[in-house]
Amino acid sequence: MKTLTSRIKRRVLLLINNFKSDCAFSILYALLRVMDELCGRVHLNKLSNIAHEKKDKWILNYLERQLSDLIQKYKNIDDIGVFEENAPVWVCWWTGVEMAPDLVKQCIKSIRKQTGSHPVHVIDQNSYSVYIDIPDYMMHKVKNGQMGIAHLSDYIRVSLLEKYGGLWLDSTIFCASSLPESYFELPFFTCKSNPTSCGYLSQMRWTTFVLGGWRGNVFYRFIKEAFEEYWSQEQA
């Protein structure tokens, strides 16, 4: 009983803290997020879905306003990039494989085994600078906690794919068989399933844990610059 009470208290405290921090961004967004969370907890799924969809729409509208110049810049550019044989496979564990849990080590081992002639590069905090540059303001926000490692990883993956192409695999993916060459033969590749209401904006139409494409694909160039624009202005 004490454990349950403690969990409830932690959840309520987290909800309150998130609401306070969200209010500094937008009161409407904060209210929609609370409604989504509370309705989901008491299984009012329809109301939760409504709040979630409105929250996503609000975010999309906000980003379209903030990134309007960048969107116009890339609106009419159609460049799918350059196909290269033996394009690399990218994996990231920020603190290094040596510090990773056994599960992650086994997954990375399986990836190395199943990629054939495609080189595997494991990116960490000591090796990223060999391949890409990360803006100082991003690293500063990572150090002070404003930008999480997951968000940094998002930037790293699109930067690598834009510059080198290849295939990004999350470090918790276990490869039980050889990776099909078809993954590398498309200018853009992602895992997907039939659209479903799942709480994610993608509705499973795309994923980022398996993501690939050709070097120089304008899609990744746009996303990379969008991340840079966003994090140069925002605090969370």
Regions found by a protein language model. Name each.
Residues 1-153, 171-236:
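Glycosyltransferase-associated regions of secretory-pathway enzymes
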Residues 164, 169-170:
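Active-site acidic Asp-centered loop
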